[in-house]
Amino acid sequence: MAKILFVNPNKWGRGITHIWIASHSGILKRNNHTVELFDATFYSDWSLNEVKFQTKNKMYKQTNYDDYLKFNSNNVLDDLQKKIFEFSPDFIFWSAISSHIHGEGEYVNIQNGYDLLKDLDKKNSILLTGGLQATSASEIILRKMEKINYLIGGESELVLLEILNSFDKKKSLNASVDLESIDGISFIKENKFVQNKKQKIINDLDKISPYDYDIFDNQSLLRPYNGSVVKAVDFEMSRGCIYSCNYCVETIIQKYYDFNESSPKTGAIKNFKSYLRNKSSKKIFDELLYLNKEKNIELIRCQDTNFLTNDRNILLELSNLIDKSDLTIKIYIETRPEGINEKSIDLLKKLKVDGVGMGIELADETFRENALNRFADQEK
């Protein structure tokens, strides 16, 4: 089967389990491909100490988080080169889209990963990657980062699987490998930009679950939370947001999949039920059960774009499954203020939600609606 090296170019110097790594690794391993990870997070010559900086700024409560960490003093480029020589991957991949798009370095992965790889000897490895920039400005990226062989626009789990399956099939037949007919990819050929037909959106998220969190080392599972150090993972129960705020990177993905129209009264995209997709309650619960009981995960950091717009029936089913279980977890979510009411608070409690993050735009109503495409009930 095909061999692929994931490179995590995270520069934050703290535990993050990037969802794209877990989602892509899971489906590739279940299809018998070999996946390994080179994680640059804890290299002293690469990463910053984000926790120390934010603690000093009073953004985080004081903890002894640093006592749990061991930074690698080796040269990150030397170690990555060694990994490539030892593993000899068919593909190298370092950026992709998931719900984890709004911060924590996801949007700069493509640049940081390329900076790590561009001057190394990749042997015969094929360089391909995805993410927001690959989706919104693929030709610019390919012209600027000219050592990249292929880009994947939009959600890339199934496209990457098709690429590896196709490669493996051709390799087993001793045939020449031609990946240029696969939907969802773009590339430069004879100095001309080629963008293939877009792949379909992943309608059934259960197809790409469960995600592979075993690929991360223990340091990546640790993070500060409310004055304590806990074992945590970044997680998604859904993908997509029903709203189309002009300042949000979510609109890049919406436009890629042709969700171009929105309501002038609410800012919600038309046909949003086809864009906002949820895992089944059973699949979510099974993942949570494994993480809590097998990996001792305490905190589930949900990166769902707007948690309270998720399918309410699925959330109710999940809350019942959690309520009847002996799960010892806390869940942190992000949502919009207008979704908060007595019923939703009761539901969040039953789901073991411990923290809620919300954003509020401090601007007058006219500017917010006309310039930001953000609508909210002033009274609420």
Kindly give the residue locations of the regions a language model identified.
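Short beta-strand/turn micro-motifs composed of small residues
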Residues: N8, D39, G131, T335, ...
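Conserved beta-strand positions
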Residues: F6, W94, T129, G153, ...
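Hydrophobic/aromatic residues located in beta-strands of well-ordered beta-sheets
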Residues: I4, L127, I182-D183, I300, ...
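A short helix->loop->beta-strand "cap" motif at the edges of active sites that frequently abuts
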Residues: A2, K122-I126, I148, L327-I329, ...
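Radical SAM [4Fe-4S] cluster-binding motif and immediate context
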Residues: S209-K380
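Glycine-rich beta-alpha loop elements in corrinoid/cobalamin-binding modules
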Residues: W20, H24-L28, T34-W46, Y68-I201
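Charged, often glycine-rich, active-site loop that binds/positions anionic groups
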Residues: D45-S73
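Nucleotide-activated donor-dependent transferases that construct or modify glycoconjugates
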Residues: A2-G13, I97-S98
